[in-house]
Amino acid sequence: ATIINDAPIVIDPKLTGNKLWEPKNYDGRFDGPMTMRRALERSKNLVSVRIMQAITPQYAQQFIQKFGFMPDKHPAVLPIALGAGSVTPWQMMSAYAVFANGGYRVQPYLIERVTDVNGRTLMRATNRIAGDEAIRVLSDRNAYTMYSLLHGVAVRGTAARATRILKRQDIAGKTGTSNDAHDAWFCGFAGNLVAATWMGYDTPKPLGARETGGGLSLPIWIEFMQDALKGQPEYTRIMPSSVVEVNGEIFYREPIDGAPLPVENTPQAAQPQPMKDLIRDQIF
């Protein structure tokens, strides 16, 4: 529920590693103070840059290694907030699996097993199950918070088409478009099935002035999921006891700086606490 300002910003060349940087939002608008959740749903670039300023690019570069990203591919400069690094769909799929499975890093694989002509198994992939042999890289409450934020994107934000077409309420994900539309992304999951789609050229060049991840990659993801999810019931995700949801926002249960916690399920007759009083700075 942290409030962050969606307003113009100019970044010094020393902080970009290159030249003076004046990032923009895709829609060209600045909508002022908003919650982190709302900013993610609207793909507000300026909010992402301010978050990166708060946590520092150096911390981000170190933290993303937990998800399998290589530090040498992600320079510790502010533009890392908007995808200045280099990633593959394979890496993105592996990273999003952490949010989908509750905080564990699992290793994807392409070939499950190899058999000979007689059906004898010659090789079988080692499958580390989340919560069993896999390493926890994110707390359950932070994984759930990320799910909640990404779920909002698929319900109210730039990926709302996925929920509408698939007619499921367990979808979470994020669209992405790089500078000059060189890359169009959608990464997400439905239940425990994770998929990442990317559209671009082998030799980077613009896909088109108006092309976006929501317009190019999201439809591919939806079409794949239409087949992959056939016969699969919706997944019910359990909220950890360490967080509480109030007015659609997720809060840690322990008090911060002695402030009282928000109250769950406020009765209709009671006066709700103003949202501005519920704001806590949460960096995770």
What are these model-derived regions, one by one?
Residues 1-60, 105, 117-145, 150-152:
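Conserved catalytic neighborhood of penicillin-recognizing serine enzymes
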Residues 15, 62-74, 121, 165, ...:
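Active-site-adjacent bridging/hinge elements
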Residues 244-284:
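Low-complexity, Gly/Ser/Thr/Pro-rich intrinsically disordered linker/tail segments
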Residues 13-18, 67, 112, 189-191:
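Flexible glycine/proline-rich, aromatic-decorated loop/lid segments
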Residues 2, 7, 78-80, 109-112:
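Extracytoplasmic/periplasmic beta-strand context in beta-sandwich domains
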Residues 38-42, 86-250, 260:
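A penicillin-recognizing enzyme superfamily signal
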Residues 18-25, 56-94, 110:
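Mid-domain, small-residue-enriched loop/turn segments at the edges of structured enzyme/sensor domains
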